[in-house]
């Protein structure tokens, strides 16, 4: 659980949830604008690498965290980006690297060591967990908004225990 005692922690929690639950890229979060969120239908629109708008479901916990940030912690600003820097001047992040910095600080606050750094680890983790839960590569690619199955295969870190679960048993002494 992310602490939310300070406004910056409220913001960081919402960002971490977007990364972990929706597998958004850091640039998706940096570019997210207030009017990209449809609160009535529970969806948000992201324009990923292709700049093609994709409409994604907004899970309740993620929506709640974003709303907490907007209502209670987001600095007053004319900037229409959802997430702003926590210190003046209050404007959007300049680069996705600032999101990676948030991930690193959150990891440090949580005492998490020995794991890869950066925000992209959440996309890898989401893909792996979906595959372990039985989702197909095509479904995972759709969720991650990949245009190519080869890209999804890179994210789909398959481990030996999972391979053993899906592998066919050795035929043994079957007649030829």
Regions found by a protein language model. Name each.
Residues 1-176:
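Conserved catalytic core of the tyrosine transesterase superfamily
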